[in-house]
């Protein structure tokens, strides 16, 4: 089950939060949801080179607050904040309410699944070999603290006549474990041969409950205890 289901949807309410926070009545729920989809599509096209990880949409009392998580916040803000003002105006027109835009920096974009997937897609569109792009992304993620990463590419890889799927994994990626912090990203590369889909899973460690110790510390503690017993016996 963990292999097939969407890793973020699987963990919603357990250790992940929703990326849309608002309440809609039965009468206007569908219109508000459609607005959200249009806003996300617009931001995806507009900020395609700004390494956007996710977009959080909140709707407090007749206005909207949009938080953009980006690996390159300077690209979003623009020179002297000009670009963000234009962006705010466009979003206000789309949503028909006053919009406040916040920019949050992603500290380690190399370990963010969505940014990694977008980066690989951009490389494939520039005719970089898919294996090289995947392996380079995996090395960067592991070097910067990811405990495991899995990347899957599907489509006419290297222009092959028959579409196929190839994937690589480094480290652990426990998709069944609910407490495991799994980040997931998906992107499409529009190549001359057709569309290639890229999926990325990044394992960042376990979400610990209060008073619980990480697995490594627990093993070390057990080792010390067994060492004391051994010394006492000798």
Swiss-Prot record:
Single GO term (MF): structural constituent of ribosome
Matching PROSITE patterns: KH_TYPE_2, RIBOSOMAL_S3
Disulfide bonds: none
Keyword presence, NADP: no
Signal peptide as annotated in the record: none
Taxonomic superkingdom: Bacteria
Domain KH type-2: 39-107
GO terms of biological process kind: translation
Keyword list, A-Z: Ribonucleoprotein, Ribosomal protein, RNA-binding, rRNA-binding
InterPro entries registered for this protein in UniProt: KH_dom, KH_dom-like_a/b, KH_dom_type_2, KH_sf_prok-type, Ribosomal_S3_C_sf, Ribosomal_uS3_bac-typ, Ribosomal_uS3_C, Ribosomal_uS3_CS
Pfam families in the record: KH_2 (PF07650), Ribosomal_S3_C (PF00189)
Positions of region (Disordered): 212-234
Cellular component terms (Gene Ontology): cytosolic small ribosomal subunit
Keyword Transcription regulation included in the entry's annotation: no
Cited function: Binds the lower part of the 30S subunit head. Binds mRNA in the 70S ribosome, positioning it for translation.
Family: Belongs to the universal ribosomal protein uS3 family.
HAMAP family per record: Ribosomal_uS3_B
Known partners and oligomeric status: Part of the 30S ribosomal subunit. Forms a tight complex with proteins S10 and S14.
Protein name listed in UniProt: Small ribosomal subunit protein uS3
Organism from which the protein derives: Thiobacillus denitrificans (strain ATCC 25259 / T1)
